Amino acid sequence: MKTWIDFDAAPVFAIPLTDAVGAVTVCEGMLIEGPQGWGEFSPPASCDDRQAGRWLTAAIEVGTVGWPDPLRGRVPVAVTIPTVSPDRARQMVTDACCRTAAVQVGEGPLAADLARLEAVRDALGPDAAIRCDANGYWDVDTAVTAIAALDRAAGGLEFVEQPCRTLEEIATVRRRVDVPIAVDQSLRDAADPRGLALAEFADLAVLTVGALGGVRRSMRVAETCGIPCLVAAEAESSIGLSGGLALAGVLADVGFASTLGGARLLSGDVVSTGRSLLTRDGYLPVAPMPPAPDPVLVQRFSATPERVAWWRERLNAAQEYL
């Protein structure tokens, strides 16, 4: 697989976000061209080399063996609302035209989270769905208190994702609250996510294609984890987001929108405007392969020489785990 791809030719891009997502202010990564098409290598900075190896496996999957045929031509998508002001949250919901919002919580004061949720509910209306992602910020007692308050502020939550860091803490929270609980980071951190049974810990699993090593490996996780699965993404361009859509398109429909609306958080993209994965009426299309990068846009959003060197080292380390 390594010999089919010229990794040295992979361009490095850096697209500023319109709004920070936690500590992330820039969408950075490499575009990997395989014999059949392009993939994206954009592991978060927190990933170790082994985890980055999974992201690289995912990046070269579509350009070498391709993705499985989808069951659906489009999937419902949730708009991501980071830690922003209530007015900004309301605007983001209105612009996205989605029927589900995934609201980041736990990073700041609970009062700010509550105000943001109330604004999101006001913008969405009473019949739309709201979920929260706490990114493991809470301990058990804080999670229990916060979830009850957030559920009231939202007028009902669809679920809360990753309230605490460990599965044991999450299981304890789940027993003490009435809101369904989802896990994602626990899957990413596992040495072998395909062998992780989750039914005793959570109600839902959130799968990220890059973190799990590609669409096919993610499908195997969905088959073995024992609970319903939906799909999410990190800060990725439309090329990377296409992998999440490919997975969502082959999984059984469990009635939850996938958190794949991240292109709206980008100040630009590496694909042409018509190919950028911006939600329309709450849905995104499932395609057999990602859109090809636009050379002009790749040049416009090219990373600095220092970041290019960093990503080259990152890629070399990840290749050891292919």
Question: Can you name each region flagged by the protein language model?
Answer:
Residues 15, 80, 184, 232, ...:
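Conserved beta-strand termini and adjacent loop/short-helix elements that scaffold enzyme active sites
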Residues 101-109, 129-136, 154-167, 179-189, ...:
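Catalytic beta/alpha-barrel core
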Residues 59, 192-297:
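Shared catalytic-loop signature of beta/alpha-barrel
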Residues 107-123, 138-142, 163-175, 190-192, ...:
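Active-site-adjacent beta->alpha loops and helix N-cap segments on the catalytic face
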Residues 96-99, 124-126, 148-157, 174-182, ...:
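Glycine-enriched alpha-helix->loop->beta-strand junction motifs that scaffold or abut catalytic
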Residues 17-19, 188, 236:
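Residue-level detector of flexible, active-site-proximal loop/helix-junction positions
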Residues 1-131, 135-153, 272-322:
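N-terminal capping/lid subdomain adjacent to the active-site entrance of alpha/beta enzymes
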